[in-house]
A protein has these predicted regions:
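Catalytic-core regions built around general acid/base machinery
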Residues: 114-117, 146-154
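Catalytic core of bacterial c-di-GMP phosphodiesterases, primarily the EAL and HD-GYP domains
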Residues: 34-41, 66-143, 219
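EAL-family c-di-GMP phosphodiesterase catalytic domain
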Residues: 1-2, 32, 36, 49, ...
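Conserved long alpha-helical elements within nucleotide-processing catalytic cores of c-di-GMP signaling
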Residues: 60-61, 70, 149, 198
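Hydrophobic side chains in well-ordered alpha-helices of soluble proteins
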Residues: 42, 59, 76, 80, ...
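Active-site core of bacterial EAL-family cyclic-dinucleotide phosphodiesterase domains
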Residues: 2-62, 99, 160, 238, ...
Length: 260
């Protein structure tokens, strides 16, 4: 199968949702010091009728414009929870992170939808992390906060994704029940040779530590990135230097080879 990026039409997304075109790949997240695998991030791929795989850029913008984002997110989360349940039954208790758009979190039925997916799959809420992109959080956050708080009370972790790319980071960290701060790759990859990026990176890690939440560095792509993450005290890392996104069976093989 080949991986290409070309935008789908609304009709193609509707048809694909009905035909189960969603294929999830999972990128490992590992402990920065031991490199032990602790979880994965679920990432969207879309399979066309001819077997071509499309990335999220071909699907998500159209889904957001056409009002299909909630249906797409529901399908992704349901698929990810079924996979999490399978891994748990096989003895692998990896945390699974799923991305959510702000429009998802303003839906009145979002908590029920997530509850249903957890109940049907039997996946444990404590192994689920909801990732919310910081730059997309709205000014009126009351409904989003309500949804996240309710899911946090059920045991799910809450991650602020792409930290450092928005404009109201401190206020959001103060108000939302975040358990994880995910530092944007723009401040991680190559930061060892860019003083301004390194300063932002270091401050973000320190902020997470002071708030008592986990820090995650994404975009770790070489040994220098890894060394910097370790020197700054980052908790978890993710990136091509560790592993590329993989289909579920490959994740298990990768973990076994590494003694996990």
């Amino acid at each position: 199968k080949t991986f290409v990026q070309s935008e789908l039409s609304e009709a193609e997304i509707r048809a694909g949702l009905a035909a189960d075109a969603i294929r999830l790949v999972y990128q490992p997240k590992v402990d920065a010091v031991s490199l032990d695998m602790v979880g994965v991030e679920a990432l969207l791929r879309w399979e066309t009728l001819d077997g071509t795989l499309l990335g999220p850029g071909a699907v998500v913008p159209v889904a957001e414009r056409s009002g299909l984002m909630f249906a797409l997110t529901q399908a992704i989360f349901t698929t990810a929870m079924a996979q999490l349940s399978q891994w748990c039954q096989a003895g692998y208790r990896w945390k699974v992170s799923c991305n959510f758009s702000v429009s998802d979190l303003t839906e009145s039925s979002i908590v029920r939808v997530l509850d249903d997916a957890l109940a049907v799959s039997g996946a444990p809420a404590e192994l689920v992390i909801l990732e919310v992109t910081e730059s997309k959080l709205p000014e009126d956050v009351s409904r989003v906060m309500s949804s996240l708080t309710r899911m946090r009370l059920k045991g799910c972790g809450i991650s602020i994704d792409d930290f450092g790319t928005g404009f109201s980071s401190m206020e959001q960290l103060r108000r939302f029940p975040f358990t994880e701060l995910k530092i944007d790759r723009a401040f991680v990859n190559g930061a060892h040779s860019m003083p301004s990026s390194k300063a932002i990176f270091e401050s973000s890690v320190d902020l997470a530590r002071r708030l008592g939440i986990s820090s995650v560095a994404e975009g770790v792509e070489d040994e220098a990135d890894l060394t910097l993450c370790r020197s700054l005290g980052v908790d978890l890392i993710q990136g091509f230097y560790i592993a590329r996104p993989m289909f579920p069976e490959a994740v298990v093989e990768w973990a076994i080879k590494r003694g996990h």
